[in-house]
Swiss-Prot record:
GO cellular component, one term: plasma membrane
Places the protein is found: Cell membrane
Entry's Gene Ontology BP terms: intracellular protein transmembrane transport; protein secretion; protein transport by the Sec complex
Residue spans crossing the bilayer: 2-22, 57-77
Keyword Transmembrane: yes
The name this protein goes by in its record: Probable protein-export membrane protein SecG
Function, as annotated: Involved in protein export. Participates in an early event of protein translocation.
InterPro entries from the UniProt entry: SecG (IPR004692)
Residues making up the signal peptide according to the UniProt record: none
């Protein structure tokens, strides 16, 4: 049981890091910090296609990570 949960946790961590790195950045870097990012406030686009899929997959993988960590702490593994 311990080995299974640990393997699932490692796979989930690798998948979560990969999905987060595949997502497109939402900031303009330093220029966005200086200008205050006002153009993003009024020109916000809805996520579509692969961006929406990656966003939802990040949420699912995060919930799985949270549940696996609760399981590890509950069972004292």
């Amino acid at each position: 049981m311990h080995t299974l949960i640990m393997v699932l946790l490692i796979l989930d961590c690798i998948a979560l890091v990969t999905v987060v790195l595949l997502q497109e950045g939402k900031s303009n870097g330093l220029s966005g910090a200086i200008s205050g990012g006002a153009e993003q406030l009024f020109g916000k686009q809805k996520q579509r296609g692969i961006d929406l899929f990656l966003h939802r997959l990040t949420i699912v993988l995060s919930v799985i990570f949270f549940l696996l960590m609760l399981g590890i702490s509950y069972f004292g593994l």
